[in-house]
From Swiss-Prot:
Coiled coil: none annotated. Homodimer. Polymerizes to form a dynamic ring structure in a strictly GTP-dependent manner. Interacts directly with several other division proteins. GTP binds at residues 21-25, 29, 108-110, 139, 143, 166, 187. InterPro entries: Cell_div_FtsZ, Cell_div_FtsZ_CS, FtsZ/CetZ, FtsZ_C, Tub_FtsZ_C, Tubulin/FtsZ-like_C, Tubulin/FtsZ_2-layer-sand-dom, Tubulin/FtsZ_GTPase_sf. This is Cell division protein FtsZ. Residues 365-388 have a biased composition (Basic and acidic residues).
């Protein structure tokens, strides 16, 4: 079912909360990148680390419990610290329509406090999305075990959860890539997610989308796949749609999604046929009875480029079996497995915004991997062609 939403676009209030060292670092890098219409909040037990935060709002939690000295890699301390400072957290969240809670799982403050913060946000009526990372395999079994428990706690607290296994970073960066540059790739998952949704609800379109549409697709769904794809030239609509639903950081496939919010932004040359082409790619990959809400925006600044933003939910939580070989710009997917599945994709994510230049060089997969012709075709595309072939034979 394809629904077209038209009407007035209400600008919702978005807040991004970084919890613990990893979350605070992610927020700092987002602020450095520059984002509008978003409020940033940093939460930590470590007073010294909190002083380094660039967020406009800073909350030192558990001052009585930890005396500003951190949680000592103990999630239980992080949890109790957040519970001690509940009123301060509530005051900071007040007025938010949507809250992103980001943290690194495996340590003390992020693992223990982030689920408490997320639960408070959801109880206050905000659409709550968790974006967390799993530790690298070399960080040890104890940290992995604590991270798995933290992910489970986050799942129970948020509307949707996006998990980024840090081990995936090893698949999308070169051996010579500096560590801080590699971590920026993980931060892009959060940044592009916030930017994509902010653009969806802040920019009026020919076929309009607003925060109510985002909430319809993401509320109480447990799992979410979100992505942005950009392309230009011949077959730009198809290529942008493929990129939006494929990412080297994804562990969950769009296959079987029952709810999809899709927006296409293009220049004045964007045609109805191109919009249909892009929608077909996404719709055919999702469940056959998908509830698809579709919007379009004309932005003359884009000229020959097309930007496709996709939010998909309501699919079974299982790791994707397809090896993603296409260059992609998707910015994250929720997972419900503690195991780290190695991705076959090797292209770096690009950073895209509907208001800025979208070109960023990336090494093509054809230069970095050797595949057969069939392997170059995503499995959902092959499945679509097989379904059409069977219908024709009938």
């Amino acid at each position: 079912m394809l629904e077209f939403e038209q009407g007035f676009n209400h600008l919702a209030t978005l807040k991004v909360i970084g919890v613990g060292g990893g979350g605070n670092n992610a927020v700092n890098r987002m602020i450095d990148h520059g984002m509008n219409n978003v409020e940033f909040i940093a939460i930590n037990t470590d007073g010294q680390a909190l002083n380094l935060s660039k967020a406009e709002s800073k909350i030192q939690i558990g001052e009585k419990l930890t005396r500003g000295l951190g949680a000592g890699a103990n999630p239980e301390i992080g949890k109790k610290a957040a519970e001690e400072s509940r009123e301060q957290i509530e005051d900071a969240i007040q007025g938010a329509d949507m809250v992103f809670v980001t943290a690194g799982m495996g340590g003390g403050t992020g693992t223990g406090a982030a689920p408490v913060v997320a639960k408070i946000a959801k109880e206050m009526g905000a659409l709550t999305v968790g974006v967390v990372t799993r530790p690298f395999g070399f960080e040890g079994r104890k940290r992995q075990t604590q991270a798995a428990a933290g992910v489970e706690s986050m799942k129970a607290a948020v509307d949707t959860l996006i998990v980024i296994p840090n081990d995936r970073l090893l698949d999308i960066v070169d051996k010579s890539t500096p560590m801080m540059e590699a971590f920026k790739e993980a931060d892009n998952v959060l940044r592009q997610g916030v930017q994509g949704i902010s653009d969806l609800i802040a920019v009026s379109g020919e076929v309009n989308l607003d925060f109510a549409d985002v909430k319809t697709i993401m509320s109480n769904q447990g799992s979410a796949l979100m992505g942005i794809g950009v392309s230009s030239g011949e077959n730009r609509a198809v290529e942008a749609a493929k990129k939006a639903i494929s990412s080297p950081l994804l562990e969950t496939s769009i296959v079987g999604a029952q709810g999809v919010l899709m927006n296409i932004t293009g220049g004045e040359s964007l045609s109805l046929f191109e919009a249909q082409e892009a929608a077909d790619i996404v719709q055919d990959a999702a469940d056959e009875d998908v509830n698809m809400i579709f919007g379009t925006v004309i932005n003359p600044e884009l000229q020959d480029e097309i930007v496709v933003t996709v939010i998909a939910t309501g699919f079974e939580d299982k790791p994707s079996s397809q090896g993603r070989k296409a260059t992609s710009t998707g910015f994250g997917s929720s997972v419900n497995s503690s195991s780290n599945h190695q991705s076959g994709a090797s292209a770096k994510e690009d950073s895209f915004s509907a208001h800025t230049s979208h070109s960023q060089s990336s090494e093509s997969v054809s230069e970095r991997s050797h595949t057969t012709k069939d392997d170059d075709i995503p499995s959902f595309i092959r499945n679509r062609e097989e379904r059409r072939s069977r219908r024709t034979r009938r």
